[in-house]
Amino acid sequence: IVPWHIISETFGLSIILVPVLEDGSINLEVLEKTLRKAKGRSIISISHVSNTIGFANNLQIISSLIRREDTFLIIDAAQSVGKIELDLDFENSFLVFSGHKVYGPTGTGCIIGSMKNLSRLCPVFGGGDMIESVKWENIEWAKVPYKLEPGTPNIAGIIGMGEALKWIQKIGIETIDSHLDSLTKYTLKKLEEIDEIEIFKPGKKHGLVSFFMKKKNSLDIATLLGSLNIAVRSGYLCAQPIVEK
């Protein structure tokens, strides 16, 4: 939600929060009513898979609610790319994900959309190789993707991210999903044996388990597990409103 707050403060746009249900899914009824009431260009921003509770939203159903040409869906797929097969129509959608979540280098990422929609985006930064011509009066941008990639790119990072995606393709998403499911079930089974632990949201978690220990500090627990070579993350998980709820 942070980027949307920045954009809202910069351009004076309105942010409307659509509530989620108990299982973590978007309230589709409220979303549909909100879209019907919206005037002018609208953007729906969702996470495909929640990075706090692991629930996956149904992208096909949400996409079907878009009935106007000036409404776009932006999908944060950082938690699902490389783990879940994706089949999307990008007529009114963009999909974004980060490189480090697909086992690639940090500082890399990707945006996927139709050439038509990507061409409508304005450059965020200025630099070389993004322009067709420069004059005193104006600038003519180069075609996509060049107009969105100014200056010297993170060449090593991009190559590393590409190799990471090839590695995922070689192993196969079905194999990865099956392995994650097995690890998740084992983790849940062991955690459920400890009375002091409360687990958030049972069900299909796509390799993600959130829990807390009653009367224990989460950072202390994470530090202890880290000393035992068990890597976990503590705190708000970049989703403070959901964790607090």
Regions found by a protein language model. Give the residues of each.
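Pyridoxal 5′-phosphate
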Residues: I1-K245
